[in-house]
A protein has these predicted regions:
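Hydrophobic faces of well-ordered beta-strands that scaffold small-molecule active sites
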Residues: 37-42, 69-71, 91-96, 126-128, ...
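N-terminal export signals
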Residues: 5-25
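C-terminal segment of N-terminal export signals and the immediately downstream linker at the start
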Residues: 21-56, 60-63
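Acidic-and-aromatic substrate-binding clefts and catalytic sites of carbohydrate-active enzymes
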Residues: 47-51, 68-80, 98-109, 133-137, ...
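Acidic/histidine-rich catalytic cores of soluble enzymes
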Residues: 158-254
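Acidic (Asp/Glu)-rich catalytic clusters
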Residues: 29-35, 59-63, 77-93, 110-122, ...
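Active-site acidic/histidine proton-transfer and metal-coordination neighborhood
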Residues: 11-12, 16, 101-195, 283
Length: 298
């Protein structure tokens, strides 16, 4: 065989193999995500609408295509739970008061009451979704918070419920040198007692790549929050200082939602929920996000 012919053949074979791998990768990414079958909406997205007309708002959520809702609290959500179920939507997850988890004195629901109600409703997940100021600024404070979460996680486990921690962006701020609060949480939270509900928006605006973070948490993520971040948004650790227009509908921002759902499946996440904290039209926004996600891979 002539050298030129050999080189040409080798080059063609290499190119064919490369294209084949690229095509397989594209096909894998383009597949309909399994999460669409159970896609949820975190009801914080439509909090104001729920106060105005609970039944109408929940019907709009169901009509948009969502299969379940994630509640903002357990105690006090009896009406939402009942109406969501009547509309054929599932309710498998709910946030809990962070003050209750940390044992802060005040008019906060008791953990035993939260777990008892969650068990009666057959919830699968409870979400510890925030750490207030004064409980997150140092390594020791974050360790104490994680210890409280582990204690609550044991209580949840006894009831057949999984606890998970939902991040914002403050956790990604360094608390000791290069060590961030999130680093401490990853080290201190017992995976058997408290997993993560990773919010990809807050991770990214906190300076962490959502995909890399998900892979770093392989086997430790039970749920994922899907929300998009405006292209070019700056890192911001104070969630109250994030501009309202930084929150985008899924597909309109800088986060690759198809890749997020693909990697979520790879790392063992059980389900996903759309959430958009700020929007001039929450009903329209949540419907647009579902339409985009449902169109991926079609």
């Amino acid at each position: 065989m002539k050298r030129r012919t050999f080189i040409a053949g080798t080059t063609a074979a290499t190119l064919s193999l490369t294209l084949s791998k690229s095509l397989r990768a594209m096909q894998e990414k383009a597949k309909k995500s399994k999460y669409l079958e159970t896609m949820g909406l975190q009801l914080w997205t439509v909090r104001n609408q729920l106060e105005e007309d609970e039944a109408k708002t929940l019907k709009a959520v169901a009509d948009a295509g969502y299969k379940q809702v994630e509640m903002g609290r357990v105690i006090g959500s009896e009406s939402i739970f009942k109406k969501a179920k009547e509309l054929g939507m599932g309710v498998t997850s709910s946030f809990v008061d962070w003050q209750s988890v940390l044992g802060i004195k005040g008019k906060h629901p008791e953990l035993k009451a939260i777990v008892a109600q969650a068990k009666e409703w057959q919830l699968e997940h409870l979400v510890f979704g925030y750490i207030g100021k004064g409980h997150r600024e140092t390594v020791d404070l974050v360790k104490k918070t994680a210890a409280k979460a582990n204690e609550f996680g044991s209580m949840c486990n006894d009831a057949g419920i999984k606890l998970c921690y939902h991040n914002h962006s403050f956790e990604f701020k360094p608390v000791d040198g290069d060590t961030t609060g999130f680093d401490v949480l990853m080290a201190e939270l017992d995976n058997e007692k408290c997993k993560f509900e990773l919010d990809v928006f807050w991770a990214k605006i906190g300076g962490w790549d959502p995909i890399e973070t998900m892979r770093k948490l392989n086997g430790r993520i039970s749920q994922v929050h899907l929300k998009d971040l405006k292209e070019g948004a700056k890192i911001e650790f104070d969630e109250s200082a994030v501009p309202k227009d930084a929150f985008e509908e899924c597909g309109d921002g800088s986060i690759d939602m198809a890749e997020v759902m693909k990697v979520a499946e790879e790392v063992g996440a059980e389900q996903c929920h759309v959430e958009q904290d700020q929007s001039p039209g929450p009903i329209e926004s949540m419907a647009q996000s579902f339409k985009h996600l449902n169109g991926l891979g079609s």
